[in-house]
């Protein structure tokens, strides 16, 4: 690449395939104008290696680094504002999922420093979903351990165990779903930003959870259209001690209520932010087929806080008991 009055750049691509693995690498070298110099020697690499090893393990490795923060974007090689290098090993079988991950992020924004570029060394996760004592029961077990450094100024370790039992009872067109679970976590927070109100300490937390819900699907059909409506109501309880002011919220900070997590027992889906209290979740989903319009899907729902302190991510005003209304609509026309 030649840039008039701004220098030259070279991009080299290399690919190699083997029976159970492949390598795909791009190397960038340049002598170009940067915000520091009229001509600066810069380089970057984006290399991916994937392999299938052992008994069902998939290993993916990526090295993605740049010697200078802006040249990849300025010369339109890559528009990313951060580069992530990682090693991930995964295995999935009928009932179990294993994941081992180590990663490092290089921030390319002017505000990024070594204190805000997260490094994970490592993150180990195990999940098993199997039958319970009854045919309608399911038991989910999760075990995870993580060490993360420089996550917006935090250095911390977390060990977590989660067990959840689900049961389903069908009675006369009404489906009753019962869930119980317990999450146990142990934290070791080694460092925090100067302005953080959380603690630098070793902390533990035990969070029991339970919910009961009902669904009542109703089907209607005509000559050229059909529709299935499913009203749903759930009551959920989250117990234990509220430690949200003590524990840094790193894995649930981006939580927002939506259709996918509205009825989950732990709808934050992370472990750092667990707020005790009770709530009522309600919604109606619809699936319709019309000869003229095609396939139509829709949902509307909300959550109401019955007890406990407000949770972030539910409403614009966190003091409201009623969450924001969650709604979606999808139309897939049938083409002739």
Where in the sequence are the language-model features?
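Outer-membrane beta-barrel proteins and related beta-barrel translocases across Gram-negative bacteria
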Residues: 1-336
